[in-house]
Amino acid sequence: MELDLLSAIIILVATYIVSLLINQWRKSKSQQNLPPSPPKLPVIGHLHFLWGGLPQHVFRSIAQKYGPVAHVQLGEVYSVVLSSAEAAKQAMKVLDPNFADRFDGIGSRTMWYDKDDIIFSPYNDHWRQMRRICVTELLSPKNVRSFGYIRQEEIERLIRLLGSSGGAPVDVTEEVSKMSCVVVCRAAFGSVLKDQGSLAELVKESLALASGFELADLYPSSWLLNLLSLNKYRLQRMRRRLDHILDGFLEEHREKKSGEFGGEDIVDVLFRMQKGSDIKIPITSNCIKGFIFDTFSAGAETSSTTISWALSELMRNPAKMAKVQAEVREALKGKTVVDLSEVQELKYLRSVLKETLRLHPPFPLIPRQSREECEVNGYTIPAKTRIFINVWAIGRDPQYWEDPDTFRPERFDEVSRDFMGNDFEFIPFGAGRRICPGLHFGLANVEIPLAQLLYHFDWKLPQGMTDADLDMTETPGLSGPKKKNVCLVPTLYKSP
């Protein structure tokens, strides 16, 4: 019996050792296929690379040395950065279902209602249902056109405001941002919120804090960092303010009979869909509030940011400014109402917009997460890997773009590339299943105001400033706004 017991122990120990060796061999084999990465430090990994630099800039530098599929260790979090059109295509088309998830973060979890929205929602039945409602009921091209008179009225108000400046500099970024917020408010709620300024400020702060680079997000196992996170408490205070604004409005909205245009606004549609028989996943109040916050984030904040970047680039390139103004003024001459379809026919204006989006995409880094282990460009991507698709770097890659850092709208006359998710060298709105569902709404909120601003005003820099003085610095955060607002002197254009 003693011999049998000894044999059993030996067999168990041998089995354990063999199992360890096999697992180590498998791990070693798997690691041989992992993406390359720079040398990392204990505990922090590659976080020191991000000190003092914007993530999209740092990640491009890493890609230039280690390739378009590179591993970065962000604290405890294993991450991979994709920095080429080919790698982006693998993640957003070939393997799209596997990369359709979003990773978790304090910012998105707190301000977007436990990710019960569309932008940050996991890839699940709730997301599929909400996206279908968004595309077919809320922000379809037909509905976007129906909001046209709202845009026109608010643009006219903006033009009157700018025209009364009397030759003084105007904070164009601030005024365009206010206009964009009013357009979204009226389209979503059928009226202007009395607290819309506070809501717009909450959107800006939330986008700055939702990038996924908060220390508590990078060390998820550390209860101490989570406890001591000042941004977590800041976000919780912001969430309470947001609830106060939206809860009060939704309660009032339930009692009114119709939207301002005699039919349904976006919130009316969501209320109706709540009661629909074909709704499989309940649409909660948090879901509605999350969608409203999505609409402000992607429909107002990014639209005003894109217009600011476009005007800044045109001010630095007077010949381009003259060319696009000549096109707009010839096409819109004598018209009091500007239709979206007319603006979309202005080829050089569309090229200016594309070039602006190439250099300054609304979301420089598109966040994803792998659902299962897979392979991209020959490298193994483990399950639950945090993915960053560096849209900013792809848009400035000399492999796809000649003189990539130069603002040259004419390049889109030479090469046909669009931003609808089919040309992976140019994906400012993403691609695949998670391409921006409000793309048409956002574009309309950029193209028409930009055309009107270029038509009605000649623009000058404030006295003493030159083109070289324009600050083109980006700020950190999920979106990529300018560090400094655009302040210009508008002069009303008088048609000959």
UniProtKB/Swiss-Prot annotation:
PROSITE patterns: CYTOCHROME_P450 (PS00086)
Stored SUPFAM superfamilies: Cytochrome P450
Gene3D superfamilies named in the record: Cytochrome P450
Subcellular location: Endoplasmic reticulum membrane
Gene Ontology cellular component list: endoplasmic reticulum membrane; intracellular membrane-bounded organelle
Binding-site list for heme: 436
A molecular function (GO) term: (S)-limonene 6-monooxygenase activity
Name this polypeptide is given: Cytochrome P450 71D18
